[in-house]
Swiss-Prot record:
It is an enzyme of class 7 (translocase). Its main location: membrane. The keyword Nucleotide-binding applies. The keyword Cell membrane applies. Residues 23-264 form the ABC transporter domain. It is found in: Cell inner membrane. One of its GO terms (cellular component) is plasma membrane. Its EC number is 7.2.2.7. It comes from the Bacteria. This is Fe(3+) ions import ATP-binding protein FbpC 2. Keywords: ATP-binding, Cell inner membrane, Cell membrane, Ion transport, Iron, Iron transport, Membrane, Nucleotide-binding, Plasmid, Translocase, Transport.
Length: 395
């Protein structure tokens, strides 16, 4: 699959091979894409997608992740042919499919609402696509049986959708999408309608199924944890464009923009000034920070995740923040203002003189809180690890 600008001097015969996908929208203007025209509304809905240039490898699990309205579902619908882009091309297996109707594209799709046929049994729902393309009855029966076993519903084939739980219905929708052995599987927020425990269980099942079948998969989600747990690569989107593409570890540990850092997890953010080398000044205090390419003296935002802050017990009342040879040591005295128990950890709000009026939020493990006797009112010392203190240019 390959999406490219209509007027670009490119072909769809990508040298990377038929198993790759390439997605591109023109960068010279925003692209208005009609979503749905509903007679009752009498208006066109538009979603704008811009600067998209993405390649998807064969067998890869990709997540489009971003806030509501960022363009992730629009992009998925364009790939599916449910919305036709006004500019740009989409290629799959070296073939331009930009203007093909959905029925002629090689994909299976699973929606948030399951979209099962309520009047058909589970077996008939799964067999629907195979019957439409005229497969022999014996082949259909064998394929349906295979898929029911694969999704753990071998004994449920003669039931109707209303007789199944939400998680079971989503498995049926997944089996139906996979019945025709598509080259591409599209998942449009498939788990968002399920309760938390079922969602966690089913995301592992979907990932395991995808690995077994080796099908190239693109999933839309706004759930950061879901994307981190399931994806081989995450495409973080914002305001119709791509902010960053990378593995879950790269996205979480090495965000390229402040938006990505803040959207994937949580961050403490401080106005700061770039110092010499790998140092930054927050307030009037010098801290060692991660390597960066920002010019000395630039006004930036310094960010650190609550989970990266390390407690060290009783405060030592070190006012300067410098070690014996004058280097920033990133140890600061802090006062525990509030604590919130969240099961696996305590979310702790700290005040620190070196940070002036800015509160510092830290996540301490239950064991650390017990070992160091941390409680509201405690005077403690915490460390901001150098490699976890990231700098970002101001927007």
């Amino acid at each position: 699959m390959h999406i490219a600008q209509e007027l670009a001097d490119e072909t769809c015969n990508s040298p990377r091979g038929a198993g790759h996908a390439r997605l591109r929208y023109p960068s010279d203007r925003r692209t208005a894409i009609p979503r749905n025209r509903r007679p009752l509304e009498g208006l066109w809905r538009f979603r704008r997608v811009r600067d998209i240039d993405l390649q998807v490898k064969e067998g890869e699990f990709i997540c489009f992740l971003g806030p509501s309205g960022c363009g992730k579902t629009t992009l998925l619908r364009a790939i599916a042919g449910l919305d036709i882009q006004s500019r740009g091309t989409i290629c799959q297996g070296g073939q331009d499919i930009s203007r093909l109707p959905p029925a002629q594209r090689d994909y299976g799709i699973v929606f948030q609402s399951y979209a099962l046929f309520p009047n058909l049994t589970i077996e008939k729902n799964i067999a629907f696509g195979l019957e439409n393309i005229g497969r022999p009855r014996r082949e259909i029966a064998s394929r349906v049986s295979e898929l029911l076993e694969l999704v753990g519903l071998s004994s449920q084939g003669r039931k109707y959708p209303a007789q199944l739980s939400g998680g079971q219905q989503q498995r049926v929708a997944l089996a139906r999408a996979m019945a025709i052995s598509p080259g591409l599987l599209l998942l449009d927020e498939p788990l968002s309608a399920l309760d938390a425990k079922v969602r966690v269980h089913l995301r592992h099942e979907i990932k395991e199924l995808q690995r077994k079948l080796g099908v190239t998969t693109i999933m839309v989600t706004h759930d950061q944890e879901e994307a981190l747990a399931m994806a081989d690569r995450i495409v973080v989107m914002n305001q119709g464009g791509i902010e960053q593409v990378g593995t879950p570890t790269e996205i979480y540990r090495h965000p390229k923009t402040l938006f990505v850092a803040d959207f994937i997890g949580e961050t403490n953010q401080f106005p700061a000034t770039v110092g010499k080398g790998a140092q930054v000044e927050i307030g009037h205090t010098r801290f060692a920070c991660a390597e960066h390419r920002l010019p000395s003296g630039a006004s930036v935002v310094a960010a650190v995740r609550p989970a990266d802050i390390i407690p060290h017990g009783a405060a030592a009342h070190r006012a300067t923040g410098l070690d014996a040879v004058g280097n920033a040591d990133n140890l600061i005295d802090a006062h525990v203002e509030d604590m919130e128990f969240l099961g696996m950890f305590w979310r702790t709000r700290l005040s620190a003189p070196r940070l002036k009026e800015k509160a510092l939020v830290a996540d301490f493990s239950t064991n650390a809180v017990r070992r160091l006797s941390i409680e509201i009112g405690s005077a403690i010392q915490v460390e901001i690890p150098q490699e976890r203190l990231l700098l970002f240019a101001k927007a």
